[in-house]
Amino acid sequence: MGLFGSFGARNKATPQVPPGAVAKAPEGTPKGPETNDQPDMDSSRLSLEARNEKEIEQHPNQVTADAHLGVQKVEAAALVWSKKAVWATYAWIWVCFFLLALQSGISGNVINNAYSGFMSAPQISTANILSSIIGGVLKLPIAKILNLWGRAEGFLVFVGVYTIGLIILAACNGPDSYAAGYVLFWIGYDAIYLILDVFVADTSGLRNRAFTFAFASTPFICTAFTAPLAASSFLRMTTWRWAYGAFAIIMPVALAPLAVVFKRYQLKAEKMGLYVRQPSGRTWAQSVAHYIHEFDIIGAFLLMAAWVLLLLPFSLASNGRAEYKSAAFIAMVIIGFCLFFAFAAWEKWFARVHFINYELLKQRTVLGACVMAATLYFSFYCWDLYFYNFCTVVYNLNAAMTGYMTQIYNVGSCFWGVVFGLWVRWTKHFKHTCLFFGLPLMILGAGLMIHFRGQSDDIGYVIMCQIFIAFGGGTLVIGEQMAVMASANREGVPMMLSFIGLFSSLGGAIGYAVAAAIYTNVFPGALESRLPADLKSNATSIYMGGYTVQQTYPMGSAARDAINYAWGRSQRFGAVAATCILILGIPAIAVWKNYNVNKHQNKGVMI
């Protein structure tokens, strides 16, 4: 592979400083003894990350005067807390990641059961596409919230969104309400995960950051074994609903203390005079209007609508609600395509603040990393969307064993991420490892899955492919995050991570759509071609019923052989698409700058 009273009283938002410009403190901002120094001509030509490093060298014990409010708050906290407090905070961040990983692992195991119970198994792609697009696009406003309001405030907001999503999932009574709850749940999950990543970036030096990011993901190693067992227990002892309901109670209690820690040290810095909060001078109504423009709500809506209307029809086709030749399918795709032009026009001529920071995105390292993220997630979800069902049916596994199969990537990538993080700390570079090790392993793993994907092949070969993909993914995910963070200043880190999140989500959504289209056009035909004549009338119920219906046919029977054959054919085309798209990763990584990570990016007590 994971958020209040700011409206009336905060500094006016300072526009992000484009590369090549000189940052200036807003009028009336208290300055330290050195802030009167005027930058020389060379300073104006420094890169964004170089100017940030110079600011840290000149004012290491002061809050950055011209930074956004959220950045000032986290700098103030970092300047006053002790090393013990940092380590204790990291321990609690690890606990938060553990609970997120556990809940996510359980959800991944019970979601197929829920949709099969609704007799709507193919509709699983609808919920995934919606949540991936909406959650991905909203990452950019979330990054702005973190800079404009503060990390703790944003964290509490999205803990609330996440909890509401869990409650809806626990109480839903059909695929439509499940999809609505799943979207809210995934928005909250993605936002919390992003904010925890930003917490880690805020409290670690750049040289150690690859390791700290990887270490923060190690809970997925633990939950790889516990989540399938927990999910199996929920399904056996209660229902899948309690798999969500229990965490609707647990998660707010576990997550909220982290926000309290950051607020406590922020208030301590205020008492010490390191950070002074300036009133904005706006009324409540003016603040609402200000944030509507600052977050570019209209731009966000246009971009979400464009992607949803372009990709969702492929999911609807997979469950029979819209054929490719139908007017509804064609209209949605055309309107979605046209909305991209509407978004471009809005951004160019009407938006006061652009939804996307194009100055950052035009940097070759940032653009290359974003393309790599989209490519990686597209490739992964081309075969992963129905991988749970495939393993359950073709290899006749129970819920726990299937859960272990689907967790191989999490275990392998998180383990290898720690090794890669230590490698980056030692060598101080990451580009060539991604290009000559991580990407080839991904291509090898996806390519071998083209062959090893049916009942005639031992499951051990599938596990081997998953390990290759896991080690490649563990390298590339950390590498692309390091690439964008190394090219940014501290204030740009949330936005950079949001870019990676946005492109990952959009790539994943396209992968979901491709997987759904392959499943729709391959599985039913392959199934019907192999079913005995007396069972052909059951083809639709077998297709719609998912693995719960398909497993009722005994292994070795003609019907089960036909089902297994259909799964093998469907997975083959998904693996072909996954392998082909990874070729784009070669130029995407090649354009990265070969950054040396042995430099300062943050102020205060760090790891």
Swiss-Prot record:
One of its GO terms (molecular function) is transmembrane transporter activity. Induction: Highly expressed under low-iron conditions and down-regulated under high-iron conditions. Expression is regulated by hapX under low-iron conditions. It is a multi-pass membrane protein. Residues 1-46 are annotated as: Disordered. One of its GO terms (cellular component) is plasma membrane. Its main location: membrane. Pfam families: MFS_1. The keyword Membrane applies. GO terms for biological process: iron ion transport; transmembrane transport. Disruption phenotype: Leads to lower ferrichrome (FC) uptake activity, which is reduced to approximately 60% of the wild-type activity. It is found in: Cell membrane. Belongs to the major facilitator superfamily. Major facilitator transporter involved in ferrichrome (FC) uptake. This is Siderochrome iron transporter 2. It comes from Aspergillus fumigatus (strain ATCC MYA-4609 / CBS 101355 / FGSC A1100 / Af293) (Neosartorya fumigata). The gene is sit2.
